[in-house]
Amino acid sequence: MDLKALIRDIPDFPKPGIMFRDITTLLSHGEGLRYTIDTLTEKCQTAGLIPDYVVGMESRGFLFGVPLAYQLQAGFVPVRKPGKLPAAVHQVEYELEYGTDRLEIHQDALADHHRVLIVDDLIATGGTAKATADLLEKIGCEVLGFAFIIELTGLGGREKLPDVPIITLVDY
C-alpha cells in the first residue's frame, strides 16, 4: 500500500517554508490505518523488538502507540509535555532551537528493568525522541528501539538516537 498517497502535504504550515505532513488523512482511512499498524507490528517482531511497554510521545505517538502495544501484547505508557500528568513525575529537560522544554512520565509507570519501544508519528531533528530515550534510560529502562510512521531524512534525527533499531514506514 502506498502510505504517502494517504498523507496530505500542507505547504507553509505552521510557518512559511515548512511542508507539513498531515497524518489525519491516513488515520481516517480504515484500510490504511490497519496496514500501518500491521506493518509496524510485523517490522517490530522481525527486528526482535518485543517490549514490556510501548512508550508513546505526545501526542500523535499515542495514536499509533496504543494499537501497536495491543498487537505486541505490551502495555502503553504516555510521555507528556509539562503539567499534563496528575501524579508524581520523572522529567527531563531538553534543548529546542530557541530555548528548552521538558518531558514527563509518571513515576509509577515504569521500573528500572522494563524494556521499552518508543513510538511517534514522525522523526525530524530527533530532539524529542532523544529526550524521551534519555528520560527512560535515566529511570533505568532499556530502550529496545524506535518506531515512526514518517522520517524526514536529511535533518539528522536518526543520528541523534541511541544505536538501536529504528523502524520507519515512509521517508521524505
UniProtKB/Swiss-Prot annotation:
Pfam families: Pribosyltran. SUPFAM superfamilies: PRTase-like. It is found in: Cytoplasm. Its EC number is 2.4.2.7. It catalyses: AMP + diphosphate = 5-phospho-alpha-D-ribose 1-diphosphate + adenine. CDD domains: PRTases_typeI. PROSITE patterns: PUR_PYR_PR_TRANSFER (PS00103). GO terms for biological process: adenine salvage; AMP salvage; purine ribonucleoside salvage. Pathway: Purine metabolism; AMP biosynthesis via salvage pathway; AMP from adenine: step 1/1. Disulfide bonds: none annotated. The keyword DNA repair does not apply. Keywords: Cytoplasm, Glycosyltransferase, Purine salvage, Transferase. GO terms for molecular function: adenine binding; adenine phosphoribosyltransferase activity; AMP binding. Belongs to the purine/pyrimidine phosphoribosyltransferase family. Catalyzes a salvage reaction resulting in the formation of AMP, that is energically less costly than de novo synthesis. Homodimer. This is Adenine phosphoribosyltransferase. The lineage of its organism: Bacteria, Bacillati, Cyanobacteriota, Cyanophyceae, Oscillatoriophycideae. The gene is apt.
